[in-house]
């Protein structure tokens, strides 16, 4: 839900910025129109289901790639390597903070969506193939875009500041007018495609919790929450980057713990889960995994104590353990160490306390079939 709000807000800001630049409106009107259009399309596509989403994704991916190459070419003239060379080097805490923030945004922030993609993969898909192609496909665009964005931000301090308020609109400001419209359309569609998948995923998540709602109603409920978040960030927040950073660091910590436990489960568990037992409160897996909840709580408490976000006033309570490494004003405060600490707590906590439980669960289960065996059938 947080990612749906973030992506939808970015799309709304991009569209409203373009409307204003083209002289088609001013004040709150462009934001209001953009909110109605973007949220409406996200809701419609999310309600109609997976097939429509996949059709949208395929087309948007191809067109976005072409438009992005054009952006690289047209924006190259705005890169000033002399200005970049004059930027002083950052310290180790700043570098780690940047790395962990990117890790949270492009890795940990999306780990829970894996089920939505993997459940549509053929059973014959190999584990190594899934890991490699998912990692490669998810990383290559991010590496290129982040590197290019750093060059642009280092060349123009004003542009770097504007990106924090309106990421897509700021990037569009360096483009010629004739390229502005196709660039904005494709950027908005790309952001919306992620929001569409998130909206669909949110609806399924509600249903999996036992909420008695039709899938369309569940998608509509998450859309209403998205509208509330978009309206807050668009109309009442001074910047986009403040709430966005707050969202990533606050939710990234418990997600890191969960991801660590999940990785341990993948490493240690040698057999497939028993599907009937997963749906049986009295089955081999039980109704509650108390150890997992304890590990999650401990990792989250430690992680939140080692992150700080001065851009969001509602998160000033975080960082209560930073006094151990120089305080909230020290150089290590912005290192986002809480994220990696949370990940390690989840990983090693599960290794230490759940290995025996997994062995008991697998005691009388048949061996898992390999991808080759499944394909042979």
Residue spans for each PLM region:
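Hydrophobic transmembrane alpha-helices that form the core helical bundles
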Residues: 1-24, 192-208
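C-terminal membrane-solvent junction of multi-pass transporters and transport-like membrane proteins
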Residues: 259-348, 363, 367
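A conserved active-site cap/scaffold subdomain adjacent to cofactor or substrate pockets
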Residues: 177-220, 224, 228
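Transmembrane alpha-helical segments of multi-pass small-molecule transport proteins
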Residues: 21-48, 62-73, 99-114, 185-188, ...
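Hydrophobic, small-residue-rich membrane helices and short re-entrant helix-turn-helix hairpins
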Residues: 48-61, 112-144, 159-170, 198-216, ...
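Transmembrane helix-loop boundary segments of multi-pass membrane transporters
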Residues: 17-32, 50-61, 169-177, 182, ...
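Hydrophobic, membrane-embedded alpha-helices of multi-pass small-molecule transporters
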Residues: 72-78, 88-152, 174-199, 259, ...
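C-terminal catalytic subdomain
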Residues: 214-278, 285-292, 339-347, 355, ...
């Amino acid at each position: 839900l947080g990612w749906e709000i973030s992506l939808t807000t970015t799309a709304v800001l991009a569209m409203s910025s373009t409307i204003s630049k083209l002289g088609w409106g001013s004040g709150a009107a462009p934001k209001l129109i953009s909110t109605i259009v973007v949220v409406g399309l996200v809701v419609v596509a999310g309600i109609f289901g997976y097939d429509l989403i996949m059709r949208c994704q395929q087309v948007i991916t191809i067109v976005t790639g072409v438009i992005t190459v054009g952006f690289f070419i047209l924006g190259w003239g705005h890169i000033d390597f002399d200005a970049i060379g004059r930027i002083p080097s950052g310290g180790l805490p700043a570098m780690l903070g940047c790395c962990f923030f990117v890790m949270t945004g492009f890795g940990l922030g999306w780990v829970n969506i894996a089920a939505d993609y993997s459940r549509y993969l053929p059973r014959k898909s190999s584990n190594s193939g899934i890991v490699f192609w998912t990692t490669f496909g998810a990383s290559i665009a991010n590496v290129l875009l982040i590197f290019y964005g750093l060059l642009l931000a280092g060349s123009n301090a004003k542009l770097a500041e504007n990106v924090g308020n309106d990421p897509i609109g700021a990037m569009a400001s360096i483009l010629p007018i004739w390229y502005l419209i196709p660039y904005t359309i494709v950027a908005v569609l790309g952001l919306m495609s992620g929001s569409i998948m998130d909206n669909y995923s949110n609806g399924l998540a509600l249903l999996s919790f036992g909420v008695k709602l039709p899938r369309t109603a569940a998608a509509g409920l998450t859309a209403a929450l998205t509208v509330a978040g978009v309206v807050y960030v668009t109309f009442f927040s001074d910047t986009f980057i403040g709430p966005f950073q707050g969202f990533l660091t606050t939710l990234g910590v418990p997600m890191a713990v969960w991801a660590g436990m999940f990785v341990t489960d993948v490493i240690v568990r040698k057999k497939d889960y028993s599907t009937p037992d997963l749906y049986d409160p009295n089955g081999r897996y039980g109704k509650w995994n108390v150890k997992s909840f304890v590990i999650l709580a401990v990792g989250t408490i430690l992680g939140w104590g080692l992150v700080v976000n001065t851009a969001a006033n509602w998160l000033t309570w975080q960082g209560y353990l930073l006094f151990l490494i120089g305080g909230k004003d020290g150089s290590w405060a912005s290192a986002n160490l809480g994220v990696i600490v949370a990940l390690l707590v989840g990983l090693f906590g599960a290794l230490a306390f759940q290995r025996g439980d997994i062995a008991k669960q697998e005691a009388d289960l048949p061996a898992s079939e390999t991808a080759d065996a499944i394909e042979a059938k």
